């Protein structure tokens, strides 16, 4: 019977009991299956299955036989299933006491065969019953390098520490920039790009005199501002000193060359720049003051706009009503005085005998008229014809968009036969109209995306 030993991250190694047993002779015929002639037990499952007559066979042979016949292969005794078989406790106990080698004594050759590893294998000899506990702790079992999936090195568990120190796939942290997860194989590439990696100055200022190494990311700054070998210009170049020299010679240059005339020229240049800046400042100051005044004007205008009233309430009393009915036949209108609501100009057109349309015949028509204005305006308005009995007042309201010179209202506000003294709408030969107007704010379009 074949024994399988699983090891960490490794394809299981298959052994036979004859590979592991210390004394093969001790495996008498009692331990062999009479059908397949293999050992009836293995180190992973120590069970000797027998029929009620005591005939022992290996589990595999029992399973194959019972698929076709429900009987013992030796005595033909009825056997319903593998689970109905009993165990030979004596054989099992004797097998568990057999001495075996640790499976980790062996190694697999490229051919797939196994051989004893005299140098690195586990030399432990133990009872079959002790194998399971030993395998869990054995430091000689084979594993794969855990550092990276790319490292396919196969080694024993007790060799892992030495391997990790030289594994080319070992992950580490850059000691300069702190980047984590670097693989040793790739570290040279990283160090060739690492901004914190110390390198020599390209101008070789790392001589014993200067002993200079710089982080790669600071090289440009170092050359432009620090490196003693960088050739620089005299700070009085604009004033006329055109000499160039290494930065390390700056002090010597300043000592050897008289820069007084250059200093005077520099001072003159600064004076000119200052005077020019002063003129620019005064010019900007004037512009600032102008803008400040403009801002105050705009604030005042804004205040006026905010104080504009965007609603209007009033009464319009039309006197001598009986005469007006005669003087203003259809479609002639009585017009109110002009009035302002906010910054918009309106008037009311009142038709005692109806307006232009045929539908307005015999009706009193009334309209709100907006004068020329380029901006469309949303207006909410109402007209209320008062009655002696206020519960009988006639009131209509509407909300409309007014464009340039247009009007909104009602062609059939009320039948003019109802506007009489008897009905209460004419009081002392006058009719009174309540006017309510409100300019509504502009509606903003919703954002869409």
From Swiss-Prot:
Record has Metal-binding as a keyword: yes
Recorded superkingdom: Eukaryota
Any one of the GO CC terms: cytoplasm
Zinc fingers classed as RING-type: ranges: 33-76
Keywords from the UniProt entry: Coiled coil, Cytoplasm, Metal-binding, Repeat, Zinc, Zinc-finger
Pfam families: MATH_2 (PF22486), zf-TRAF (PF02176)
Coiled coil start-end: 263-309
Chief place of localization: cytoplasm
Function (record text): Probable adapter protein and signal transducer that links members of the tumor necrosis factor receptor family to different signaling pathways by association with the receptor cytoplasmic domain and kinases.
Zn finger (TRAF-type) start-end: 133-187, 189-251
Listed InterPro entries: MATH/TRAF_dom, TRAF-like, Znf_RING/FYVE/PHD, Znf_TRAF
UniProt comment concerning the protein's domains: The MATH/TRAF domain binds to receptor cytoplasmic domains.
Molecular function via GO: zinc ion binding
Designated name of the protein: TNF receptor-associated factor family protein DDB_G0272340
Location of the protein in the cell: Cytoplasm
Family membership noted in the UniProt record: Belongs to the TNF receptor-associated factor family. A subfamily.
Residue ranges constituting the MATH domain according to the UniProt record: 311-437
